[in-house]
From Swiss-Prot:
It comes from Lactobacillus johnsonii (strain CNCM I-12250 / La1 / NCC 533). Its EC number is 5.2.1.8. The gene is prsA1. It catalyses: [protein]-peptidylproline (omega=180) = [protein]-peptidylproline (omega=0). PROSITE patterns: PPIC_PPIASE_2, PROKAR_LIPOPROTEIN. InterPro entries: Foldase_PrsA (IPR023059), PPIase_dom_sf (IPR046357), PPIase_PpiC (IPR000297), PrsA_foldase (IPR050245), Trigger_fact/SurA_dom_sf (IPR027304). This is Foldase protein PrsA 1. It is found in: Cell membrane. The lineage of its organism: Bacteria, Bacillati, Bacillota, Bacilli, Lactobacillales.
Amino acid sequence: MNKTWKKAATVLAFAGIALSATACSGGKAVVTYKGGKITESQYYDKMKESQAGQSTLASMIVSDALESQYGKDVTQKQVDKEYNKYKKQYGSQFDSVLEQNGMTASTFKDNLKTNLLTEAALKHIKKITPAQEKKAWKNYQPEVTVQHILVSKKSTAEDVIKQLQDGGDFKKLAKKYSTDTATKNDAGKLPAFDSTDSTLDSSFKTAAFKLKTGEITTTPVKTQYGYHVIKMIKHPAKGTFKEHKKQIDNQIYQSMSEDQNVMRSVIATVLKRADVSIKDKDLKNVLSQYVSSDSLSK
């Protein structure tokens, strides 16, 4: 499961167990068998003792609190857009990737919505400072467009570079050598990206940003996927901060979202505003990673 999928899978992963809304109502059987039965109350008692059950309850509380406070900021259209982005990225493997991660299309969409709600909470609760923007702008690189050829062996990449230096055609070499099936038949061309892009390996971006328009990497670029030969198609001037403020702010919030301490603080604020009250003393610590149990048991 790569970084992108992990991100999609989210801030709070849902265990695949549902707690009945009437779980503590008493003796209704959820399972019967020869000589006995398992009641809702028995099931509930076991569930609340388990880590999976407590994690599910915590996820339900956080998700409901986020929905209550920021639901107006997230539309189904946004959720569907995110879903279709991942579906396109994984292509024919999408269903198997869902299965490998223990998800259905429905639960994955739930997770995506939780992500979007969490992003909304982050942007409402944590405000960006001019100092943060100044620091981010210093390291910012605008959108560039590149071609690449991905191979599994360093020696193959070195051979491709030599052929290019001898006048070889990048498009033909990409089709012949590249193992990136998504780009090899399109001259190895990738979608434009800037330094805020989180889908590309950092070493790939670093190597690409050093190139001027028309230049090719003179040594193979190693990433988790193999070895790349990169050609810069378009490398524009940096421009002004005002032109890229939106991207800069998105980058800052992206960094915040990857900081566990920041996100724990955001969720804690959401829970305090929700005035959550844990009625079952056995579950008083279910949200202890965010807030003190004393503030929830009333």
